[in-house]
């Protein structure tokens, strides 16, 4: 039976620290590194090895997790790792960077016999503390299999998105939804506020109902975005979603008009909900266009 992989972790910030804390129990051992002594101290006290440099982590790890701020920091860390790591080492970048950055760094690493994975995460610091992150991994299938078990310390969903860069592309698509939804939430707050409602109560309603329905992810079950064929199982279901959505969006827009409040995202949603679901615009949208 093979010995457990030795794991290194570079970057003990808001996300990196709780992820690394979950790895303290990893049987292969954990070596950590951060430029801030106060970030490293709790790990040393908990029994982790501490390296005083990125190269020092490379010398002690078979898999190195990187959770630093941005593309520039990732490039600097990976450059130092690639000069010190033994062939066969896997470098997993958890930072959200440009997919092209991941592709470029993977080529550089491959020239030195190393494998780079882009492995961004979703779930935030609370998810990391609970071991409930989702990790989207781009890279070879063999490298993915090597990291799957240690990643399981801080994630309960680890997916192989495809080749290097695919993990980042999936994260960007996921976060597009996240921040468009945040923007829509601010529009909903403005409508509620203009109508004289308590927007903190609206927030409670949204969090309660999303916990039950699953939020936007509840409709993300098809394996393609093309228009739905007449005999497709999803046709009647998503037409029903469209009809409900168009009715409620239309009512919200009418309320906004009465309050002299512009709701640009709601207008776009009314126009694009049906086509986006693959079922075309419904009667409510067509009526509004023709009125």
Q: For the regions a protein language model found, what residue spans apply to each?
A:
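Rossmann-fold dinucleotide-binding core
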Residues: 7, 96-175
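Rossmann-fold NAD(P) dinucleotide-binding segment
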Residues: 54-115
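Helical "substrate-binding/catalytic lid" subdomain
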Residues: 167-258, 272-290
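Hydrophobic beta-strand scaffold residues
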Residues: 30, 50, 115-117, 158, ...
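NAD(P)+-binding Rossmann beta1-loop-alpha1 motif at the extreme N-terminus of oxidoreductases
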Residues: 1-66, 88-90
């Amino acid at each position: 039976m093979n010995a457990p992989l030795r794991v290194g972790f570079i970057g003990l910030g808001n996300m990196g620290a709780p992820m690394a804390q979950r790895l303290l129990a990893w049987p292969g051992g954990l070596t950590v590194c951060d430029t801030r002594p106060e970030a490293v101290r709790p790990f040393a006290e908990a029994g982790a090895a501490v390296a005083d440099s990125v190269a020092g982590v490379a010398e002690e790890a078979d898999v190195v997790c990187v959770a630093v701020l941005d593309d520039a920091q990732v490039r600097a860390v990976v450059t130092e790792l690639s000069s010190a790591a033994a062939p066969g080492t896997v470098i997993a970048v958890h930072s959200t960077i440009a997919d092209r950055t991941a592709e470029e760094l993977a080529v550089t690493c491959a020239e030195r016999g190393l494998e780079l994975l882009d492995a961004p995460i979703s779930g935030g610091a609370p998810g990391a503390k609970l071991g409930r992150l989702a990790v989207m991994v781009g890279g070879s299938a063999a490298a993915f299999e090597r990291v799957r078990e240690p990643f399981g310390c801080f994630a309960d969903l680890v997916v192989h998105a495809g080749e290097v860069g695919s993990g980042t592309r999936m994260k960007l698509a996921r976060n597009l939804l996240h921040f468009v939804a945040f923007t829509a939430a601010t529009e909903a707050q403005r409508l509620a506020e203009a109508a004289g409602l308590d927007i903190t109560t609206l927030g409670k309603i949204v969090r309660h109902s999303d916990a039950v329905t699953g939020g936007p992810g509840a409709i993300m079950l098809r394996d393609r975005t093309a228009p739905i064929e007449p005999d497709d199982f999803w046709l009647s279901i998503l037409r029903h979603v469209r009809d409900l959505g168009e009715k409620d969006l239309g009512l919200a827009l009418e309320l906004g008009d009465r309050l002299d409040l512009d709701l640009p995202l709601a207008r776009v949603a009314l126009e694009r909900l049906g086509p986006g679901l693959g079922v075309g615009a419904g009667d409510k949208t067509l009526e509004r266009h023709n009125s």
